[in-house]
Amino acid sequence: MKRLALALKQKKVASWKLEEVKELTELIKNSNTILIGSLEGFPADKLHEIRKKLRGKAIIKVTKNTLFKIAAKNAGISTEKLEQYLTGPNVFIFTKDNPFLTNMFFENYKLRRYAMPGDKAEEEVIIPAGDTGMPAGPILSVFGKLKVQTKVQDGKVHVVKDTVVAKPGDVIPTEALPILQKLGIMPVYVKLKIKVAYHEGLVIPAENLKLNLEGYRSNIAEAYRNAFTLAVEIAYPVPDVLKFTINKIFKNAITLASEIGYLTPESAQAVISKAVAKAYALATAISGKVDLGVKLPSAQQTQTQQSTAEEKKEEKKEEEKKGPSEEEIGSGLASLFG
């Protein structure tokens, strides 16, 4: 630091630069994460809004790239891997927070600004009905070009009805720009573009900072569903699984009881139904040779009954395969996603 001060003194560097480097050095030392954002195309006057939002969470500094590099060196950080990002006007964000969550804030936080020539509309740009506060005069012809119906009342221009002057994707008409400004309409969204993050020695480019939360949620839900199905199959002894496991075991026991004719209050209906079905099948097989003196169901009825029984079996199998419902998965993930 003494060498730097001496070198700067010899070159007659302004004292504010010395103070700036000193402040930046302390910020770098006391921050877990540093994000570098581009100020190209971003209104500098909008930074105060971001500062207010991040107050207590991050410190935002606009400084020269050369001063940042000197400060980083003083703090014991090599800027070799950051060189490609230290071009053009930049803003530096110093924080102790996670770089991914901090970047997500900038991804989602959009600010409005007035439209400039060549800007495209992201949503419908509407001139609303009512008093514009503009005196009648040449401005009427501008409204006419934009096909905005007007009337003059008390010497002021009034818009008759809400009028769309640009749809999403359209270039906002140049004629509309001064009118939109006078009406205080800011139709263009801007956000601070993060170039890179430096976190505890790691350099993380912007493309690697983006979080696909919906994708993560879907993957976790799928993993939970698969784990739950496996847990039911192996009868893993936890409360959420056991209610499904016990139900499955009970169904399997009833099926086995009906096959071997084991009679209990719970299996009685299944055992008797199975016995009746076998009796009818046997009676049908010998009815052509022996007069049994009973009326047997037709082949079609028997087939229908068998089909119905098979469908019920299939439904049971499907229910077992499905495992937990979406609601149950949701409650299971509640602790993860709040």
From Swiss-Prot:
Residues 297-338 are annotated as: Disordered. Belongs to the universal ribosomal protein uL10 family. GO terms for molecular function: large ribosomal subunit rRNA binding; structural constituent of ribosome. Keywords: Ribonucleoprotein, Ribosomal protein, RNA-binding, rRNA-binding. It comes from Saccharolobus islandicus (strain L.S.2.15 / Lassen #1). It comes from the Archaea. Transmembrane segments: none annotated. Residues 298-308 have a biased composition (Low complexity). Forms part of the ribosomal stalk, playing a central role in the interaction of the ribosome with GTP-bound translation factors. This is Large ribosomal subunit protein uL10. It holds the Pfam family Ribosomal_L10. SUPFAM superfamilies: Ribosomal protein L10-like. The keyword Cell membrane does not apply. One of its GO terms (biological process) is cytoplasmic translation. GO terms for cellular component: cytosolic large ribosomal subunit. CDD domains: Ribosomal_P0_L10e. InterPro entries: Ribosomal_protein_uL10, Ribosomal_uL10, Ribosomal_uL10-like_insert, Ribosomal_uL10-like_insert_sf, Ribosomal_uL10-like_sf, Ribosomal_uL10_arc. Residues 309-325 have a biased composition (Basic and acidic residues). Part of the 50S ribosomal subunit. Forms part of the ribosomal stalk which helps the ribosome interact with GTP-bound translation factors. Forms a heptameric L10(L12)2(L12)2(L12)2 complex, where L10 forms an elongated spine to which the L12 dimers bind in a sequential fashion.
